[in-house]
Design a protein with these regions (language model features):
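Acidic (Asp/Glu)-rich catalytic clusters
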Residues: 94-101, 126-144, 199
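A short, conserved beta-to-alpha structural element at the edge of catalytic cores
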Residues: 100-123
């Protein structure tokens, strides 16, 4: 193990997904009162910490490719942003590009309107429109699926479940012209039947919240919420790597 300023990390990252490669789960960036909304200045501090501590942001595709002999940079970390809020374009993307960092954005395809005049507002937040989703992809960001309508999948009939999982991927791939290989379970709802539908739809992997593991369809993430300081993030990442190392990662 090696140490940067008190942060213990595995010097040899495990090729198994989610073990030794922490995945951070963000939602929104802004000034509202939602506890899952991170303030812009907090995101700045977190991204600056990752950069100064020598972390390299990678995509989920790069992590899974490592299972097949692909190479990951040292001290890899995955940044993910769920739901596809407009701040992904206005707040997150500029900050990532400024630092040469990358992230995975999980999009609710049914919430993406064609233009700003018809932009969807839900949960008191505005969502991306299709040209903004394309701009994320064109900037080198990874796009994943978060279903068509952000429903609790275990409550749906088999046909509706399959449609939510399958149609979102198909729509995103058709619009972007590139593969969409990763899925995020809405509400962390991942029953055995839901997982089977995700696998059958052709995804390579899926992410959950804190109740996950290193399995490629239940990849665990660390929840980022309002109030997390760089010192807090240092502790979270240290604990993640300690666990992976102890388990043989």
């Amino acid at each position: 193990m090696a140490s940067w300023g008190g942060l213990l990390v595995c010097t040899a990252l495990c090729a198994a997904c989610g073990r030794g490669v922490p995945i951070l789960m963000y939602h929104s960036v802004g000034g509202d009162s939602d506890p899952l909304t991170v303030a812009p200045e907090e995101l700045d501090a977190q991204l600056d910490f990752l950069e100064s501590a020598g972390f390299n942001t990678v995509t989920l595709r790069e992590v899974l490719d490592a299972q097949d002999g692909g190479k990951l940079p040292r001290h890899a970390v995955v940044l993910t942003f769920d739901d596809g809020y407009v701040d992904a374009s206005t707040q997150v993307l500029p900050r990532l590009l400024q630092r040469g960092q990358k992230a995975t954005f999980f999009i609710v395809s049914g919430f993406c309107a064609q233009d700003a005049a018809t932009r969807v507002t839900k949960w008191q937040k505005q969502f991306l429109i299709w040209p903004e989703v394309r701009a994320l992809a064109d900037a080198g960001m990874e796009i994943g699926s978060h279903t068509v309508s952000h429903l609790r999948l275990s409550n749906l009939s088999g046909a509706d479940l399959r449609a939510q999982v399958r149609d979102s991927r198909a729509t995103l791939q058709s619009y972007l012209g590139k593969p969409v290989d990763f899925f995020a379970y809405p509400y962390n709802d991942q029953s055995r039947w839901v997982r089977r539908a995700v696998e059958t739809a052709g995804y390579r992997g899926a992410v959950v919240g804190s109740r996950g593991n290193s399995d490629s369809f239940t990849l665990q993430r660390l929840t980022m919420h309002r109030g997390i300081t760089p010192a807090d993030l240092r502790s979270m990442l240290s604990e993640n790597w300690e666990t992976a190392y102890t388990e043989g990662g």
